[in-house]
């Protein structure tokens, strides 16, 4: 059966193959798979996004990403969703953003919200909704355990990456690297400290989004620690990321928050590159300590791990990624879940939302 799926991204962030955020990358993979399999994929995302299906572009909010821009983006998203549902027969809405509750439509269309971030970053009330057509999904078992135990129906579909686009190389170079959004919770200043302590070359790749806290973090915590051996190379496209991960001796993931998943760690392993990380959130689900990387507790242990990471097997890292982190497995599980929710929504009139139950959320 051919479905029409509306995927909704965060209003202020573009989606596409080169997107920095995990939620944008997962949305991009699902959009491509829907289109490839003959479904109609509608993507509501910021202007400038690149999708395989049909882009419904939300206008840019301006150069500054602040509370006013966020509020404006949420209002625009809400109106666009209402307009889409008035014109197109949508089978399911898949929300991917932290603030999805601000533009939930009042509709009998089944809705799935994937929680890409720690559960305590979302309003507690989303876990208390009953008898409505909003369904929640987690991206790791660790994240699911952090959700309120009173909500037994949250599904778990682990993230995956396109492992076939990453390839090991025998030409390993001497640098460690880190990659991601340049923001305080990623802890990249700690990776710089560890690299300096280990006297290791280090590359930091990523985008600085125009949030004042992100810019301040880079200026105060990152820039002063850069030198000829430890460099910041800015954002990189997908092809460059493939090369960098393959040639790195290891990936460093010094996250200071409970990661719900870690796509770049999966990509590194698919490249035959081991990962050294703090045991934050779901990272112990991804890294097999002493076999595909090391789980460390502090900067000193990260530096020590840098000195011995060369003894780990690149082939073993690659085998682990192929066995556990394939995007094909993720996509199949999502599509099965879509079908279940769509068929359930068609047969259960009690799942039609009462606007009064969601008024506190949608404003």
Which sequence ranges carry the predicted segments?
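Catalytic cores of nucleotide-sugar-dependent glycosyltransferases that transfer UDP/GDP/TDP-activated
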Residues: 1-363
